[in-house]
């Protein structure tokens, strides 16, 4: 593992603190009028999801976490979890439901996901930032709905995600959804 100095701290950098992998969410460089400069960072634990704050004196160094990202295609889901396959090596990886709870509504077969591995074990699965999903159910848009100021209505996608869509979107239509926020982006033309 490589050691990085506090001057190299950046948002998104993966470091190891007390033997645990962390992701830097926020990095503030503070240079007080008196005393030594320091970095105050906010980090998220990859294994537990817990967010903590740490302070490092300027010039200190920490080790980078042994984290590897692999792009893999979702083959299928079953009672145990989801099975992903690397398109180049055809190697398969089974990820159990405990690690998929926060992205369960974004699981769609034959879609490429990013598997985050720490010391060879899957610690997280990241969906693509944008996904094209079909609307499974939504209330029909009624003429005059916009007069009340309501331009969005609830909808459920084919993956089970609950999103808000414009009133002109009907069941069966393809929409582009931002998986980070769960928000509607645009209608997809066929």
UniProtKB/Swiss-Prot annotation:
It holds the Pfam family Elong-fact-P_C. Transmembrane segments: none annotated. HAMAP family: EF_P (MF_00141). One of its GO terms (cellular component) is cytoplasm. It comes from the Bacteria. PROSITE patterns: EFP. GO terms for biological process: peptide biosynthetic process. Keywords: Cytoplasm, Elongation factor, Protein biosynthesis. It is found in: Cytoplasm. Its main location: cytoplasm. GO terms for molecular function: translation elongation factor activity. This is Elongation factor P 2. Pathway: Protein biosynthesis; polypeptide chain elongation. InterPro entries: Elong-fact-P_C, NA-bd_OB-fold, Rib_uL2_dom2, Transl_elong_fac_P/YeiP, Transl_elong_KOW-like, Transl_elong_P/YeiP_cen, Transl_elong_P/YeiP_CS, Transl_elongation_fac_P. Involved in peptide bond synthesis. Stimulates efficient translation and peptide-bond synthesis on native or reconstituted 70S ribosomes in vitro. Probably functions indirectly by altering the affinity of the ribosome for aminoacyl-tRNA, thus increasing their reactivity as acceptors for peptidyl transferase. The keyword Protein biosynthesis applies. Belongs to the elongation factor P family.
